[in-house]
C-alpha cells in the first residue's frame, strides 16, 4: 500500500517550485500544500547552481493567502476550488510533481551515508541524543525544512525534526521538557528571546503580551541545540489518519467567538490541532464539537478541563457524522485565536 501524504512533506514541481504539504486531507489526484520556495536570481537558499527565495516569511494564514497571488499570476493550475472544504486552496496535481520529499527517508539517508556538513552533523548528534534519552527508534524521526530538500545553509538554517506517531510524540515531549528544564543539552528561550517572541506575535494575533507569555510557557516543541534553533513537529502515522477525502464536507458559516471547556486534547499535537470541547458558549447559542487549528502556535497548549476563549470561522460539517466546528488559522480566519481564560 502506498504511503499516505503527510503534513510537512515537501514537493518539488516540474517548474522547480517547492511546496510544503499541509495536514492530511488531500484529493486523490493532488496534494494540499502551500508555496514556500521559488527559483530566483537572488536568495539565501542554494542547491547546486539553483538559488531559491522564500515566498512565505513565516507560517500564518495571511502569508499563505498572499502566495495565492503569486500562483494566480503565473501558476494558476496550483489553485484548487475544493468541493469538500468549499474554499480555494493551493494544491499540487500529482502529474506536476517532479520529486516528492519524505522526512523519514531523508533522515535515514543522512544516518546511512553520513553527514555532509556541520548542520547535518548537529542533526545526527541531536537524533542520537533523543534516541538515547527516550528509547524511540530512528524510524520514529525525520527531518523536514531546507535540510529535506538539500537547500539548507549551515550558517543560518534551522533543524526541523518530525516526530512520527502519537506514542513516540508523547514519549519525546516529556523528555524534551525534562532536558530543557535542566538547561543542559537542549536550551529553552532565555528571557530576552521569550519577550521578543511574544512581542512579534502581538502584531499578528489579537492577543496581549501576557496571553502570549502563557502560551509560550505551554509550548514544548522548540529549543536551541548547540546554538541552532530546533523545532519538533508531530506527524500522524498512516494508521492515525482516519479521514479520507470526501468522508466529510465543510460549509463555512461566518465568524464565531465564544468560550468552551476542553474535553479531549490528545490530538492537539498534530496539524491541524483538534480540541474536543463541551459547554460551549457563543452568541449564536450553538453546540460546537471541536476547535480545529491550522495555526501551529495553538497546538498542544490546552488541557482537558480547562476553559478557553476562541474566535474563528464556524463550519457546519456533514458526512459520517454531522456537527459544528470552529476553524482557527485556516482560510478566511484572519484574526482567529485560542487563549486560556
Task: Indicate where each model-derived feature is located.
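Catalytic core of pol beta-like nucleotidyltransferases
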Residues: 1-143, 147-156, 164-341
Amino acid at each position: 500500500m502506498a504511503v499516505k501524504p503527510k503534513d510537512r512533506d515537501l514537493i518539488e514541481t516540474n517548474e522547480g517550485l517547492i511546496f510544503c504539504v499541509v495536514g492530511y486531507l488531500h484529493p486523490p489526484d493532488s496534494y494540499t500544500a502551500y508555496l514556500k520556495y521559488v527559483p530566483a536570481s537572488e536568495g539565501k537558499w542554494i542547491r547546486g547552481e539553483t538559488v531559491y527565495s522564500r515566498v512565505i516569511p513565516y507560517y500564518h494564514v495571511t502569508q499563505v493567502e498572499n502566495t495565492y497571488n503569486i500562483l494566480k499570476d503565473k501558476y494558476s493550475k496550483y489553485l484548487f476550488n475544493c468541493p469538500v472544504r468549499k474554499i480555494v486552496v493551493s494544491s499540487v496535481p500529482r502529474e506536476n510533481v517532479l520529486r516528492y520529499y519524505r522526512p523519514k527517508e531523508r533522515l535515514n539517508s543522512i544516518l546511512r551515508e553520513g553527514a555532509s556538513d556541520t548542520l547535518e552533523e548537529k542533526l545526527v548528534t541531536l537524533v542520537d541524543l533523543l534516541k538515547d534519552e527516550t528509547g524511540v527508534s530512528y524510524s520514529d524521526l525525520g527531518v523536514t525544512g531546507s535540510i529535506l530538500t538539500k537547500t539548507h545553509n549551515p550558517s543560518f538554517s534551522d533543524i526541523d525534526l518530525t516526530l512520527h506517531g502519537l506514542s513516540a510524540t508523547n514519549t519525546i515531549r516529556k523528555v524534551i521538557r525534562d532536558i530543557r528544564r535542566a538547561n543542559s543539552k537542549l536550551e529553552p528561550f532565555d528571557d530576552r528571546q521569550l519577550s521578543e517572541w511574544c512581542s512579534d506575535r502581538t502584531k499578528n494575533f489579537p492577543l496581549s503580551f501576557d496571553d502570549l507569555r502563557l502560551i509560550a510557557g505551554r509550548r514544548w516543541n522548540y529549543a536551541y541545540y548547540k546554538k541552532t534553533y530546533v523545532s519538533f513537529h508531530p506527524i500522524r502515522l498512516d494508521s492515525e489518519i482516519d479521514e479520507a477525502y470526501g468522508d466529510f464536507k465543510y460549509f463555512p458559516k461566518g465568524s464565531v467567538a465564544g468560550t468552551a471547556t476542553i474535553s479531549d486534547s490528545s490530538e492537539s499535537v498534530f496539524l491541524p490541532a483538534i480540541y474536543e470541547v463541551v459547554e460551549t458558549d457563543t452568541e449564536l447559542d450553538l453546540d460546537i464539537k471541536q476547535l480545529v487549528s491550522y495555526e501551529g502556535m495553538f497546538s498542544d497548549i490546552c488541557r482537558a478541563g480547562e476553559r478557553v476563549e476562541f474566535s474563528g470561522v464556524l463550519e457546519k460539517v456533514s458526512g459520517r457524522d454531522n456537527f459544528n466546528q470552529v476553524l482557527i488559522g485556516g482560510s478566511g480566519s484572519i484574526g482567529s485565536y485560542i487563549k486560556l481564560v
